Amino acid sequence: MPGRTWELCLLLLLGLGLGSQEALPPPCESEIYCHGELLNQVQMAKLYQDDKQFVDMPLSIAPEQVLQTFTELSRDHNHSIPREQLQAFVHEHFQAKGQELQPWTPADWKDSPQFLQKISDAKLRAWAGQLHQLWKKLGKKMKPEVLSHPERFSLIYSEHPFIVPGGRFVEFYYWDSYWVMEGLLLSEMAETVKGMLQNFLDLVKTYGHVPNGGRVYYLQRSQPPLLTLMMDCYLTHTNDTAFLQENIETLALELDFWTKNRTVSVSLEGKNYLLNRYYVPYGGPRPESYSKDVELADTLPEGDREALWAELKAGAESGWDFSSRWLIGGPNPNSLSGIRTSKLVPVDLNAFLCQAEELMSNFYSRLGNDSQATKYRILRSQRLAALNTVLWDEQTGAWFDYDLEKKKKNREFYPSNLTPLWAGCFSDPGVADKALKYLEDNRILTYQYGIPTSLQKTGQQWDFPNAWAPLQDLVIRGLAKAPLRRAQEVAFQLAQNWIRTNFDVYSQKSAMYEKYDVSNGGQPGGGGEYEVQEGFGWTNGVVLMLLDRYGDRLTSGAKLAFLEPHCLAATLLPSLLLSLLPW
């Protein structure tokens, strides 16, 4: 496969210290959707407010004909087609965005899933019912032409229908789908989940990994590896061991991708530890953000531009596109031009892989393959040791991203610093108590509208003041699973705050959003490269999960007080006194 050959060559060059000066391969081979003069002229003309719109538009005719016509037109205008004629060319040769998809109502959707009956508050129960209805609005299936003429689409064909995030995101996304599936399973839509899982497994069989999303321009980057965790959620609800048996080797293949292509060695205390990072050695601007990437690169020397574009893609692969996480420690921590994603070993990525390795061991044991079960048990043990040595900080009581260049931890606050608690990847039985102190020390419990993504105000969307649903889940579920009563109560109060934020905004705007602003009364968030999006797949999924877990206690009323230690003690006191009474 040409892309794989390019990557192997690039890894060799990087090993020889030739990285930033070498031309990197493009995101995909398409000279329309991924690289080339046509893409450059259209995107730099800014025909559309959002660069993603153009690269999502299907072709009206074969790509060879489109390119030939464009080449002739460009030559006639000295390779600079006037805007009006460029617009006319696009109008003639491309279809409107979204033409390749059609609405889909899942066959397994039902009116009243059981979990709704667990919600005591009538307003919250009605709201949950409305969110359950949204699965029909977010359902999509591909038209047959995507299969018969794939060269005319940037969309990657998937056999089974799926749920999309919403807004500008009309295709599937990898890590979003984990929380979407959690919500779908509560809605008793296991067949929909199975189809989405099969789509991802098919992609692994074809490409060796799950791409960032369902477009060809996403092919060479992935997202946080949650496929094995998705399979576990599905199995927990269905006990479909036959499906696991059919696909266990494909799950292993995906983990192999991360081992072979995203592994780094960290030397500490006389030992070498293998951990993973986000790393996308492919050049050129991101097609879906082309003009922004070109303009950002124009601020750098020409020899540094390819490296910048590769780091931007790695940031997109992280799911946190973009954040101070990937800027801190570099020469320009206040600008996206200083992004250095691949220079950091992320806590959350390694916690996800740690849990995946534990699940793979359990899966193989379930299937009677003891040798493979042992293999993954050893891998998990090795990763746990690496997490404990390289990322864990005993004094602070949290894990931190490790800077490969500075050879030190990034001690800034991010909810991802507690992902090992969520993933069950720790060995210290007192870790939940330390995590609570860490949250208190950073005054995170004083935020009434959700846990902020960081305490850095950079204008990036994965920073303060935005709060994102999956990060709420990482902290809340991590604390909820702890045996410590205080941790469980904080988890509930955090869940209550997040539910009220989402419910209040929905009551005002009749919409769910991808992110919320904790500094502005929990209103829809902002910042980043595009306007805040409605929908919204994983936000809906997390809300349904919290309503399922705490439905008998959650209320739609006024906000609670800050979760300062003294307030928390007051909250806990009645339940503690009740527990002492003889019954």
Curated annotation (Swiss-Prot):
Its EC number is 3.2.1.28. Residues 557-583 form a propeptide. GO terms for molecular function: alpha,alpha-trehalase activity. This is Trehalase. A lipid is attached at S556 (GPI-anchor amidated serine). Expressed in kidney, liver and small intestine. Also more weakly expressed in pancreas. The lineage of its organism: Eukaryota, Metazoa, Chordata, Craniata, Vertebrata. Belongs to the glycosyl hydrolase 37 family. Substrate binds at R168, W175, D176, N212, R221, S222, Q223, R286, P287, E288, G319, E529. It is linked to Trehalase deficiency: An autosomal recessive condition characterized by the inability to digest trehalose, a disaccharide found in mushrooms, products containing baker's yeast, and dried food. Individuals with trehalase deficiency suffer from abdominal pain, increased rectal flatulence, and diarrhea due to osmotic water flow into the colon. It is found in: Cell membrane. Homodimer; disulfide-linked. It comes from Homo sapiens (Human). InterPro entries: 6-hairpin_glycosidase_sf (IPR008928), 6hp_glycosidase-like_sf (IPR012341), Glyco_hydro_37 (IPR001661), Glyco_hydro_37_CS (IPR018232). It is a lipid-anchor; GPI-anchor. Keywords: Cell membrane, Disulfide bond, Glycoprotein, Glycosidase, GPI-anchor, Hydrolase, Lipoprotein, Membrane, Signal.
